[in-house]
Amino acid sequence: MIAALYEKHLLPHLIDFACGMKAITRQRSTVVPRAHGRVLEIGIGTGLNLAHYDAEKVDTLCGLDPSLALHAIARDRLAATRLKLELVPLSAERIPADDSSYDSIVCTFTLCTIPDPLTALSEMRRVLKPGGELLLSEHGLAPEPSVQKWQHRLTPV
């Protein structure tokens, strides 16, 4: 019961805080605006990328994340944008889309959390249109001690 309360009420806010740090936000702001056309975001989480999309370049956005608790926060963030968003409660190992469906796929600081990253990457390749872009940003251990502290706290997640 305590684990369920933690997962539903505390963990989403910890993830949001840790993933919203300045260094990570700067990286998001260089990667996400490149997305265009029909966009799939892998691990949309709490919607921290939503503010970085160029609404003039994005026709539709599908956000994939297995956590419904994170979807609720993403929906709140969506209100501050002009994006059309569909949230799908699935992991990236089974993307519910036809082959060659997306112009851009955005995956920021998520691949390290996917149980089977090779299958997820294979699925991303399958649904990405020929000539489409996979906009990927991952991290190793950050040089900033304050970021490292949060990375270590979230490692079990």
Which residue stretches match the model-derived regions?
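Conserved alpha-helix/loop element of class I SAM-dependent methyltransferases that forms part
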Residues: 18-38, 48-52
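Conserved SAM-binding loop
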Residues: 63, 87, 103-106, 136
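A short glycine-rich, Lys/Arg-flanked "PGG" loop and its adjoining helix->strand segment in the class I
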Residues: 118-133
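C-terminal alpha-helical "lid/dimerization" subdomain adjacent to the S-adenosyl-L-methionine
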Residues: 7, 14-21, 135-157
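Class I SAM-dependent methyltransferase SAM/SAH-binding core
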Residues: 40-42, 46-94
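N-terminal, positively charged/glycine-rich alpha-helical extensions of SAM-dependent methyltransferases
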Residues: 1-11, 23-28
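A short acidic, Gly/Pro-enriched loop at the edge of an enzyme's catalytic core
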Residues: 93-105
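A short SAM/SAH-binding and catalytic strip from SAM-dependent methyltransferases
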Residues: 104-116
